[in-house]
Curated annotation (Swiss-Prot):
Binds to STX1A. Interacts with DNM1; this interaction inhibits the binding of DNM1 to AMPH and DNM1-receptor-mediated endocytosis. It comes from Rattus norvegicus. The keyword Transmembrane applies. Residues 7-26, 33-49 have a biased composition (Low complexity). It is a single-pass membrane protein. Residues 1-74, 191-244 are annotated as: Disordered. This is Syntaphilin. The modification Phosphothreonine is found at T214, T235.
Length: 504
């Protein structure tokens, strides 16, 4: 009996287990959990089982009157509960993995952004460093430029000082050129005046009385009262030719001769008797009778006549006089050209071969309308008292001692060539230009080349002229050089002709 009871109980329990319907279980997330696969095959329950009725009975809250139903999990077996937990964990794991993937994606995006930001920051840093380096270089360049500006300023200051010195030098040169031009003008005017006075002073006693004038008329305006003084047109051509005036003679001999004549004239002014006493002296032992001595003697006698302004007899024999006058006579004798004296003497010897041979003899020349033959005087020296001529129109006789030396005739032939050369040189006109045009052009242009080069090379400041006065003058002379040379040549030819006419 007992065995049957236990078997019936086991069968009822197994039937219960088999007849238990599948229960839908909801987890905490609201998901339905299915029954186990092991119970699926045995679950052929009937309608009379009490468990399904309960579940169907308490499905609504209004049915159980506010009492919460028990969780369906408590009716599951532990294995089913484990399965449910595993499923729940898998779902959570899946959600977590999805979240992790999303966060990894976000992290990747953030990393990408960070890398971009880093790159941008690096670029900005590079730009900043480059800007700092450029700033440093710019500061260095600014310093260098400041140094360059300072050096340029110093150089400009030095150049300005140099330019000021150059301008001062240029002004000095301009002043020198102006002074030179002025002096040249004065010299040209003086030469022209000397030529004019030389032509008019053909009968001056200190210059024009040569040995040839002893045998001709005296053309002094003071002696000949009917002629005007200083007028070359009133002087005959033969008188001017015999006067032997040379415009280019030395000034020293002229002044010394004038001093001699002034001394004689002062001696005449002292008084008539004193002049007659002083005018009679003898230089025989000290000065032998020579051509120069005769020339000076005749010049002094003519000066005495010019100062007295009267026609008087002039004595030819002299006594010893003051040593000052003798010194002057020595200087004048040394200043005279010996060659011209010898040539004149030789020509005179040829013209007058029949003259007296006595060294103490003299020749009397009558100054009048027509020259007369020389009158030889063979007597010794005698003292003559000057007497006033009552008739001023009568001629005046001048007595000059003559020395006939044989050595002079021999020396005249030796000095003829030198005299001809000197006379030709004196006849040549003065010319400031050369024979070739190119030489004159180079002489005018070459001194202006450094100034022009300096003006072209230097930096011209505002208001500074681009020309130099000296270079401008030279440029004008260069342009008009041909005309200047032609005008100068045309001016020098008439002067040469006039001077040649006044010479012997």
């Amino acid at each position: 009996m007992a065995m049957s009871l236990q078997g019936s109980r086991r069968a009822s329990a197994g039937s219960r287990r088999r007849t238990s319907p599948p229960v839908s279980v909801r987890d905490a997330y609201g998901t339905a959990s299915l029954s186990s696969s092991s119970n699926s095959g045995s679950c052929k329950g009937s309608d009379s089982s009490p468990t399904p009725r309960r579940s169907m009975k308490y499905t609504l809250c209004s049915d159980n009157h506010g009492i919460k139903p028990p969780t369906p999990e408590q009716y599951l077996t532990p294995l089913q509960q484990k399965e449910v937990c595993i499923r729940h964990l898998k779902a959570r794991l899946k959600d977590t993995q999805d979240r992790l993937q999303d966060r990894d994606t976000e992290i990747d995006d953030l990393k990408t952004q960070l890398s971009r930001m880093q790159e941008d920051w690096i670029e900005e840093e590079c730009h900043r460093v480059e800007a700092q380096l450029a700033l440093k270089e710019a500061r260095k360049e600014i310093r260098q430029l400041k140094q360059v500006i300072d050096t340029v300023k110093n150089n400009l200051i030095d150049k300005d000082k140099g330019l000021q010195k150059y301008f001062v030098d240029i002004n000095i040169q301009n002043k020198k050129l102006e002074t030179l031009l002025h002096s040249m003008e004065v010299a040209q005017n003086g030469v022209a005046k000397e030529e004019g006075t030389g032509e008019s002073a053909g009968g001056s006693p200190a210059r024009s009385l040569t040995r040839s004038s002893t045998y001709t008329k005296l053309s002094d305006p003071a002696v000949c009262g009917d002629r005007q003084a200083g007028d070359p047109s009133n002087t005959p051509a033969e008188d001017r030719a015999d006067s032997g005036f040379v415009a280019a003679d030395d000034t020293l001999s002229r002044t010394e001769a004038l001093e001699a004549s002034s001394l004689l004239s002062s001696g005449v002014d002292c008084g008539f008797e004193e002049a007659s006493l002083h005018s009679s002296f003898n230089l025989g032992p000290r000065f032998p009778a020579s051509n120069t001595y005769e020339k000076l003697l005749c010049g002094m006698e003519a000066a005495v006549q010019a100062s007295c302004m009267q026609e008087r007899a002039i004595q030819t024999d002299f006594v010893q006089y003051q040593p000052d006058l003798n010194t002057i006579l020595e200087k004048v004798g040394q200043a005279q050209g010996c060659s011209s004296v010898l040539k004149d003497r030789h020509s005179e010897l040829d013209l007058h071969p029949s003259g007296p041979r006595d060294p103490d003899s003299a020749v009397v020349v009558t100054v009048g309308d027509e020259p007369e033959a020389p009158e030889p005087i063979t007597r010794g020296p005698a003292i003559h008292r000057p007497a006033v001529n009552s008739n001023p129109g009568l001629p005046v006789s001048v007595v000059c001692p003559v020395e006939e030396e044989e050595e002079a005739a021999a020396a005249a032939a030796a000095a003829a060539a030198a005299t001809t050369t000197t006379t030709t040189t004196e006849k040549e006109p003065k010319s400031y230009w050369s024979r070739h045009y190119i030489v004159d052009l180079l002489a005018v242009v070459v001194p202006a080349v450094p100034t022009v080069a300096w003006l072209c090379r230097s930096q011209r400041r505002q208001g500074q002229p681009i020309y130099n006065i000296s270079s401008l003058l030279r440029g004008c002379c260069t342009v008009a050089l041909h005309s200047i040379r032609r005008i100068s040549c045309s001016l020098s030819q008439p002067s040469a002709g006039s001077s040649g006419g006044s010479q012997l």
